[in-house]
Amino acid sequence: VPVVLSTVETKSFSGNLWPQIQALFPGHAPIERSSMNSWDDPNFVAAVEKAGRKKIVLAGLWTETCVALATVQMLHDGYEVFVVEDCCGDVTQLAHDNAMKRVVQAGAKPVTALSVMLEWQRDWAAKGTYPAVMDIVKAHCGAYGMGVEYAATMLHGAPPTQLPGYTIPHAGGAGGHAGGRAAAAKA
């Protein structure tokens, strides 16, 4: 999937792209722009056009400006835009919600990060991407990730997933269950 990264006035306004995002795309420099609307920037438009896709998956900070303005213009220019609602943010929840209403009324399709990832996965038999998808699900998808982890460890006997930066404490006490630790802590 082609990716276009963009930042706005990093030296005077917004700062650099978050390192957690940049780390996913090493050697992929963000397009620096001055306009809040990325679609006003000829370099951004050229990068999107070079990708040759008419379906755009868009996410970003400041839903009511950076995301909404670009979305409305892309729709006007014939693109089909999917706004990843849970990967956008704004100064208030109300501002975010109103911006999402605006882009949906203009014709954008609201999606979530999980729905995009699973649509791209499409088939659990696609083993080339399955392990990475499951790692993302377990690390970032709440109850779904917990269910996947439970099924893997309790039903299929897999070892617990070790996430970077986390350790799984040894469960001592009553048969290794948390209840044993709680009882010991009360004693």
Predicted regions and their residues:
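Active-site-adjacent betaalpha module
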Residues: K11-A187
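Short beta-strand segments at enzyme active-site cores
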Residues: P2-V8
